[in-house]
C-alpha cells in the first residue's frame, strides 16, 4: 500500500476503553501506518499534544472525540506559528458529533481513521469570539444553549443526540427568550430570541439544522434567530418551509456583534461563554482539515 506520513491521535479520555478503536488502530499500524496516540485528562492537554505533534513532525493531528475535542485541537492548531503545521483529522466519538456528521465524516471507525490520515487537506474557516475563544462549528444562544448544557450526562450516554430533544421537551415550561441586539454587515436586528445560531457549520444540539446554508470555506458566518413560539419545531427538527416564516430571522456576515441588557450564554462547540457583549468574526482559511471529496459544506 502507499506510504502515508505519521499522524498523532488526540483521544478524549472518555474513549480509552473503546476496543473497536484500539483494533482499528492496530490494523492500520500493521498496514504500515505510523499512528501516535495521546489521551486527554484535563483542559490544556490538547494544546500540549499539538506541540508534541509538531516536534514529532506528523502530517496530521486527529481529534478523537466530540465537538468539544475537535474545538480544542483545532484551536491549538490555528495558534501554531511557522511552516509545516499539521492538518486536522476528525474521528467522531462524542455524543452528538454535529460537526463531523455535517461535513460527512464516516461513522465507521476504520473509514474515519483512513480519511483522517489520507484524505485531502482543505483550508477551512474558523470563528473567534471577543478575540479569544474560537469555535469551528457553531455558537448557539438562548433556550437551545441551556438545553445542551443542562442535559444530564447519563441521558446523553444512553440516547445520544436524541437526549437533547427529550430534555428540551421536559423544559418547555421554563422557556424564557433572551432580549438582545445583533449587528453585522448589512444586518441589524433587535428583539427577543428563543434560539440564536451563528454557524460556521450547519448543525448543533444533536442534529438540529440551525444554519442550513452555512459553508466552512466561504469566509462568512450564517445567522439564524428563532423568535416567537418556534422553539418546539426547532427542537424536533420539523420546521417546514420557513422562507416566509416571520419567526425566523436570517443573515450572513463575516462578523456579528451581540449586545444584551443582561447576561446571556453562548455555547461554543460545547463550551459555555457568558457575557453581555460578544464580537464574533470569521477567520478565513484558518486551518487545513482532511475531508471527504463530497463534503457538503464546501463551496
From Swiss-Prot:
Transmembrane residue ranges: none
Positions bound to Mg(2+): 215, 218, 220
Cofactor note: Binds 1 Mg(2+) ion per subunit. Ca(2+) may be able to substitute.
Enzyme Commission number, as recorded: 2.7.1.-
GO-annotated biological processes: phospholipid biosynthetic process
Family: Belongs to the diacylglycerol/lipid kinase family. YegS lipid kinase subfamily.
Protein name: Probable lipid kinase YegS
Amino acid at each position: 500500500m502507499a506510504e502515508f506520513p505519521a499522524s498523532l491521535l488526540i483521544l478524549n479520555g472518555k474513549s480509552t476503553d473503546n476496543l473497536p478503536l484500539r483494533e482499528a488502530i492496530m490494523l492500520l499500524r500493521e498496514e504500515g501506518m505510523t499512528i501516535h496516540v495521546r489521551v486527554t485528562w484535563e483542559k490544556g492537554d490538547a494544546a500540549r499534544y499539538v506541540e508534541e505533534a509538531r516536534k514529532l513532525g506528523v502530517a496530521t493531528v486527529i481529534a478523537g472525540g466530540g465537538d468539544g475535542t475537535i474545538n480544542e485541537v483545532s484551536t491549538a492548531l490555528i495558534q501554531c506559528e511557522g511552516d509545516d503545521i499539521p492538518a486536522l483529522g476528525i474521528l467522531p466519538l462524542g455524543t452528538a458529533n454535529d460537526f463531523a456528521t455535517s461535513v460527512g465524516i464516516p461513522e465507521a471507525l476504520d473509514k474515519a481513521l483512513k480519511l483522517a490520515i489520507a484524505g485531502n487537506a482543505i483550508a477551512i474557516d474558523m470563528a473567534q469570539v471577543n478575540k479569544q475563544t474560537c469555535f469551528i462549528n457553531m455558537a448557539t444562544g438562548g433556550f437551545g444553549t441551556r438545553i445542551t448544557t443542562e442535559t444530564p450526562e447519563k441521558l446523553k450516554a444512553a440516547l445520544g443526540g436524541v437526549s437533547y430533544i427529550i430534555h428540551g421537551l421536559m423544559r418547555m415550561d421554563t422557556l424564557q427568550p433572551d432580549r438582545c441586539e445583533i449587528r453585522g454587515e448589512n444586518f441589524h436586528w433587535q428583539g427577543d430570541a428563543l434560539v440564536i445560531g451563528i454557524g460556521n457549520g450547519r448543525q448543533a444540539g444533536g442534529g438540529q439544522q440551525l444554519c442550513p446554508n452555512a459553508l466552512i470555506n466561504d469566509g462568512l458566518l450564517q445567522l439564524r434567530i428563532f423568535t416567537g413560539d418556534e422553539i418546539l419545531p426547532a427542537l424536533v427538527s420539523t420546521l417546514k418551509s420557513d422562507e416566509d416564516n416571520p419567526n425566523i430571522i436570517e443573515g450572513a456576515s463575516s462578523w456579528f456583534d451581540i449586545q444584551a441588557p443582561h447576561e446571556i450564554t453562548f455555547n461554543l462547540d460545547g463550551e459555555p461563554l457568558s457575557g453581555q457583549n460578544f464580537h464574533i468574526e470569521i477567520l478565513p482559511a484558518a486551518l487545513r482539515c482532511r475531508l471527504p471529496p463530497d463534503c457538503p459544506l464546501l463551496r
